[in-house]
């Protein structure tokens, strides 16, 4: 099925019966591709539009990947991205451009433990339905810059530990964030170099 999926994607003729139907099918395909491609993995334009749950997708199979290009994935129906790249410890560069995240509700722990991640552009993500960003970037020790100023955080309820141990993240733009519905902001900037702190459940920039 996998070869059919990719060929039909490239031709723009993907039929419903040829797409991935479950998270398990996607993981099996990814594991096969990672085995073939090694440390530098390119899997573009994958149609996962029939799947709502991508949680822990690379957990246990992405440890040795250094560069990962997942641009153009069709993610319009995905609701759960919890721990998606959990402990991809060798990962330095990740390309997720073109993702439709408008229906995602949970991004908790999404990049948890990506200790060597240096390059990540998620500035254009639609986060209007996200409720949890808890520990989303926990332990991303080598990230130096992130522009998240365009994010809609009006429905987020938890940012606990979101930037925990992002010790090099000095260039972080959170301007315009709405934290009015957040219930838990504990440890949001713990051991983080970004010029922000939490005061009365609000994110305040340190001058």
Where are the regions that the model predicts?
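Negatively charged
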Residues: 1-207
């Amino acid at each position: 099925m996998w070869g059919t999926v990719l060929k039909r994607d490239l031709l723009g003729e993907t039929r419903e019966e040829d797409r991935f139907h479950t998270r398990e099918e996607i993981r099996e395909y990814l594991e096969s591709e990672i085995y073939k491609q090694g440390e530098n993995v390119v899997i573009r334009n994958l149609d996962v539009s029939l799947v709502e749950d991508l949680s822990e997708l690379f957990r246990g199979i992405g440890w040795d990947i250094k560069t990962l290009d997942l641009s153009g994935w069709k993610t319009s129906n995905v609701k759960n991205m919890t721990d998606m790249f959990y402990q991809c410890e060798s990962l330095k560069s990740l390309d997720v451009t073109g993702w439709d995240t408008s229906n995602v509700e949970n991004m908790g722990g999404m990049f948890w433990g990506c200790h060597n991640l240096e390059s990540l552009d998620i500035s254009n993500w639609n986060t209007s339905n996200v409720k949890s960003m808890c520990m989303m970037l926990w332990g991303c020790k080598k990230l130096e810059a992130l522009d998240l100023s365009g994010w809609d955080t009006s429905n987020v309820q938890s940012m606990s530990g979101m930037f925990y141990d992002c010790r090099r993240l000095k260039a972080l733009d959170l301007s315009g964030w709405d934290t009015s519905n957040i219930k838990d902001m504990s440890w949001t900037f713990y051991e983080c170099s970004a010029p922000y702190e939490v005061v009365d459940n609000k994110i305040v920039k340190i001058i």
